[in-house]
Regions:
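Short hydrophobic beta-strand element within catalytic cores of glycosyltransferases
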Residues: 176-187
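Conserved donor-binding/catalytic core segment of Leloir-type glycosyltransferases
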Residues: 72, 76-93, 99-103
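Acidic donor-binding loop of glycosyltransferase active sites
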Residues: 25, 151-166, 179
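A short, active-site helix/loop in glycosyltransferases that binds the activated sugar's phosphate group
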Residues: 18, 22-59
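Short alpha-helical donor nucleotide-sugar binding micro-motif in glycosyltransferases
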Residues: 21, 140-141, 148-153
Length: 235
């Protein structure tokens, strides 16, 4: 992965990087976008092979008892559409954009945030400051509950904003469970290769008020169940 945030470290590792790239017989990347957006790889494209990340499909296949659990999850939120996030609570995941987007959302839905991380306390404080009853933190989930939450959700929120998010395995997991996603445009990242704008979900440009434009995209998908179905069944 390219060094994005700690850019000052790059000068220390750059000689090693050049040496390794020169010596390599094959360089594996997870998407064409990452290949084309990585400056060190531009002169060695003939060495590059694209091998996407994969998921364990068996973990996300519906099992006996899942339908009842999915209904239980929906009932927890009074049957309102669920906008679901699952991932580590770190800076590049862009979770403040999701939490701040809530103030602009006009649809009657809930935002359910799964996972934990170094920013969890700060994110909970931000949500508390919003004083909104529709933002819920559920922490780490078991494999069974994660699967059921993905099927229960109407929309999968994936608000990452930097190339540190190189692919988006969680996107693939959500899409396997027929849950369309809303992502940001991330230049040089495979995120927009996994979630295809207007085909499997909605891609939001990082221009203007990011919180507001993200909210508008979430609203559009939450309100349009026909569009949800169209995106979820795309091949």
């Amino acid at each position: 992965m390219d060094i994005i945030r700690q850019w000052y470290l790059y000068w220390a590792v750059r000689p090693w990087e050049k040496w390794i790239i020169k010596r390599a017989d094959c360089i594996v990347v997870t998407s064409p976008q990452y290949r084309d957006g990585s400056k060190p790889l531009q002169k060695v494209k003939e060495k590059i092979r694209i091998v996407p990340n994969a998921i364990d499909e068996k973990l996300f296949e519906l099992r006996i008892g899942d339908k009842e659990r999915i209904q239980e999850i929906r009932a927890l939120y009074n049957g309102k559409p669920i906008v679901f996030f699952m991932g580590r609570h770190t800076k590049y995941k862009g979770l403040p954009h999701l939490i701040e987007a809530e103030r602009y959302m006009k649809s009657d839905c809930v935002i359910v945030i799964g996972g934990k991380g170094p920013l969890t306390k700060r994110l909970k404080a931000l949500a508390k400051k919003r004083n909104s009853a529709r933002i819920h933190f559920v922490g780490r989930l078991s494999e069974d509950d994660l699967r059921c939450y993905l099927y229960a959700a109407s929309v999968f929120a994936f608000p990452s904003v930097t190339k540190n998010e190189a692919f988006g395995v969680a996107l693939a997991e959500a899409m396997y469970c027929y849950t369309p996603a809303v992502t940001f445009t991330i230049e040089g990242s495979g995120v927009n290769w996994v979630n295809l704008n207007g085909i499997t979900g909605i891609e939001v440009s990082q221009k203007g008020n990011l919180n507001q434009v993200y909210a508008e995209a979430l609203d559009k998908l939450v309100r349009d169940t026909s569009l949800q179905k169209e995106y979820s069944r795309a091949e």
